[in-house]
Amino acid sequence: MKQLYWYTCGEGDCDLVLLHGWGLNSGVWHCIIDRLAPHFRLHLVDLPGYGRSQDYGAMSLADMAERVAQQAPKQALWLGWSMGGLVASQIALSQPECVRGLITVSSSPCFTARDEWPGIKPEVLAGFQHQLSDDFHRTVERFLALQTLGTESSRQDARLLKSVVLQHQMPDVEVLTGGLEILRTADLRTALSGFTLPFMRVYGHLDSLVPRKVASLLDSAWPQTQSVVMQGAAHAPFISHPNDFAKLILNFAEENKK
């Protein structure tokens, strides 16, 4: 079996697995490692087809979750950002023995706008999929720029995201298209409605990809979960507000100690 890139560090006794979003790799977490490493055993994963896990083609959400779970510690906290939030959520649903708590960041159980549900317009995602084959690098750059739009440090944060992408070979177009297909089609709203493990959802107030209205809708639909909307943050709050973000994670872990 081909191994995913899986880097473990930290001095704590609580396992925390971090899953990156579309187009990126585990390098995106380096800005908060120093803040979390004293408290956790961190597991930084390159999802199949991304970063240093290049030996994979496009995968479905279920297959990606199954593959990641195969290398995972038991009873870990899982933190998934954006598309990584879908992967972490799918693992929590299908491999609950791996999970003691779930944190999703700037993520949605359904990224696509539907009747009375806010999200990305289907034609926008379809447009990104089409543009990948025409102008691969520019399409990825446009998507990264959307993630930091509106924050005080928008340009600086976008440059950081771009540098993370360029650290390693770019994912294949097939992998990126498959990731957009996951964002376009996945809908875990019903499946997660009965989820009973500790679950925190973190949002950016200025996020243009996951509207903050998602937070209030899920507060009503999933009253057993908790949500935090970070003021001044967009789609990557751990980059624009690393100290506040790290405190949220530490508090969640402390409140849900076993």
Curated annotation (Swiss-Prot):
- Enumerate the UniProt keywords alphabetically: Biotin biosynthesis, Cytoplasm, Hydrolase, Serine esterase
Domain AB hydrolase-1: residue ranges = 16-242
Query: Is this entry keyworded Transmembrane?
Result: no
Q: Where is the active site?
A: 82, 207, 235
Family annotation (Pfam families): Abhydrolase_1
Please give the Gene Ontology molecular function terms for this protein.
Answer: pimelyl-[acyl-carrier protein] methyl ester esterase activity
Q: Which pathway does the database say it acts in?
A: Cofactor biosynthesis; biotin biosynthesis
InterPro entries per UniProt: AB_hydrolase_1, AB_hydrolase_fold, BioH, Carboxylesterase_BioH
Q: What is its EC number?
A: 3.1.1.85
Which residues are listed for substrate binding in this entry?
Answer: 22, 82-83, 143-147, 235
**Subcellular compartments:** Cytoplasm
Membrane-spanning residues:
none
Top-level taxon of the source organism: Bacteria
Q: What is its main location?
A: cytoplasm
Q: What biological-process terms (Gene Ontology) are attached? A: biotin biosynthetic process
Query: What reactions does this protein catalyze?
Result: 6-carboxyhexanoyl-[ACP] methyl ester + H2O = 6-carboxyhexanoyl-[ACP] + methanol + H(+)
A cellular component term from Gene Ontology for this protein is: cytoplasm
The record ties this protein, via PANTHER family, to:
HYDROLASE ALPHA/BETA FOLD FAMILY (PTHR43194), PIMELOYL-[ACYL-CARRIER PROTEIN] METHYL ESTER ESTERASE (PTHR43194:SF5)
* Subunit description: Monomer.
The family assignment reads: Belongs to the AB hydrolase superfamily. Carboxylesterase BioH family.
The job of this chain, per UniProt, is described as: The physiological role of BioH is to remove the methyl group introduced by BioC when the pimeloyl moiety is complete. It allows to synthesize pimeloyl-ACP via the fatty acid synthetic pathway through the hydrolysis of the ester bonds of pimeloyl-ACP esters.
Which HAMAP family does this entry report, sorted A to Z?
A: Carboxylester
Question: Under which name does UniProt file this protein?
Answer: Pimeloyl-[acyl-carrier protein] methyl ester esterase
